[in-house]
């Protein structure tokens, strides 16, 4: 017999954050790593485009704060989701694993939010 009142799962929320983090890591993060980690140190790029004053002004704007927040939080959720399910696949069962990994991601999200807002 089919259960008429199935328990609602919270997994779609975590899969959504995992998927968004995975897409961010695949599309946005490599561009930023190449720009900040390779091109800028080599001096390739417009003169003064990434001066301290311009980067600080960007980081303190609402678009910059949103970008920094997403650049930190989305890969964080993706990574902790992968670790949680990877440990499950390896049959390493952490007591209250969902609370440990997703709770850590939530705490670090709040810490990141506080850090970005007070920038």
From Swiss-Prot:
Localization per Swiss-Prot or TrEMBL: Cell inner membrane
Membrane protein topology class: Multi-pass membrane protein
Keyword Cell inner membrane carried by entry: yes
One annotated Gene Ontology cellular component of this protein: plasma membrane
Major subcellular site: membrane
InterPro entries (alphabetical): Fumarate_red_D, SQR/QFR_C/D
SUPFAM superfamilies: Fumarate reductase respiratory complex transmembrane subunits
Any one Gene Ontology BP term: fumarate metabolic process
Entry keywords, A to Z: Cell inner membrane, Cell membrane, Membrane, Transmembrane, Transmembrane helix
Record field: transmembrane: 24-44, 55-75, 99-119
Gene Ontology MF term list: succinate dehydrogenase activity
Gene3D superfamilies: Fumarate reductase/succinate dehydrogenase, transmembrane subunit (1.20.1300.10)
Pfam families: Fumarate_red_D (PF02313)
Function field: Two distinct, membrane-bound, FAD-containing enzymes are responsible for the catalysis of fumarate and succinate interconversion; fumarate reductase is used in anaerobic growth, and succinate dehydrogenase is used in aerobic growth. Anchors the catalytic components of the fumarate reductase complex to the cell inner membrane, binds quinones.
Subunit structure: Part of an enzyme complex containing four subunits: a flavoprotein (FrdA), an iron-sulfur protein (FrdB), and two hydrophobic anchor proteins (FrdC and FrdD).
Family: Belongs to the FrdD family.
Protein name per the record: Fumarate reductase subunit D
Taxonomic lineage from the root: Bacteria, Pseudomonadati, Pseudomonadota, Gammaproteobacteria, Enterobacterales
Gene giving rise to this polypeptide: frdD
């Amino acid at each position: 017999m089919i259960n008429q009142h199935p328990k609602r799962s919270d997994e779609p929320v975590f899969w959504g954050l995992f998927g968004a983090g995975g897409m961010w890591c695949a599309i946005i993060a490599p561009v930023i790593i190449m720009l900040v980690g390779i091109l800028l140190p080599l001096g390739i790029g417009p003169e003064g485009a990434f001066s301290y004053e311009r980067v600080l002004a960007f980081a303190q704007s609402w678009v910059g704060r949103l970008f920094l927040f997403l650049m930190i939080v989305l890969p964080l959720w993706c990574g902790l989701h992968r670790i949680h399910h990877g440990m499950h696949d390896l049959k390493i069962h952490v007591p209250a694993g969902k609370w440990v990994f997703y709770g850590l991601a939530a705490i670090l999200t709040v810490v990141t939010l506080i850090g970005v807002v007070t920038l």
